[in-house]
Amino acid sequence: MDRDTAWALLCEHTKTEHLRKHALAVEAVMRHLAPRYDGDVETWGVVGLLHDFDYERDPEGHPQNGRPILEQAGLEGELVHAIQTHGDHLGIPRRTPLEKALYAVDELSGFVIAVALVRPTKRVAEVEPASVRKKMKDKAFARPVHREALLAGAADLGVEFDDLVRDTVVALSGVADRLGLEGTAPA
């Protein structure tokens, strides 16, 4: 499935701007990570873009109830499977770098954006791993984010958490304008 088809599918099932921005953020980070794991940039991007496409319509059944829609739309089986693995509640083991990366960056991308949004400049490029770690200790900040999952995702992917935060910041900086953020740090 190409990106245009994936975007159309996302927009058909996801109407809220917030969830579309989340999809764009995860797509950006997945595209950034793909070459490091010998993954296809387009494929990894499509998986990131579609991973929550069914959440708005069926949060309780997500992501398993979206599976037939993805299959009918022509998404390859291993990519559908990767999307299924990003939900802990299903208990599907994550085995491939694609599956592990999706899990690792799903909540992290949103958390990094939340950290950027509370900065006076709203510049995602200024977010440092230390700032993310500090906000992780504040249980009232971005309350729904599972802190343990942030750390576990990086560990399962085989990277240091701070390095994954840096990669996430770099990737999000490239799409900051589409996310309602400032991109680069001032010169």
Region locations from a protein language model:
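Acidic/His-rich, divalent-metal-binding segments that scaffold phosphate/diphosphate chemistry
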Residues: 1-58
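Active-site hotspot residues in diverse enzymes, especially metal/ion-binding acidic/histidine motifs
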Residues: 24, 28-33, 42, 160-174, ...
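Conserved active-site and cofactor/substrate-binding residues in soluble primary-metabolism enzymes
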Residues: 1, 5, 21-25, 61, ...
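C-terminal binding/interaction regions
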Residues: 124, 130-183
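Divalent metal-dependent catalytic cores for phosphoryl transfer on phosphate-bearing substrates
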Residues: 37-142, 151
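Active-site oxyanion-binding pockets that recognize sulfate/phosphate
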Residues: 12-16, 98, 158
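Predominant activation on well-ordered alpha-helical scaffold segments within soluble catalytic domains
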Residues: 7, 11, 24-27, 31, ...
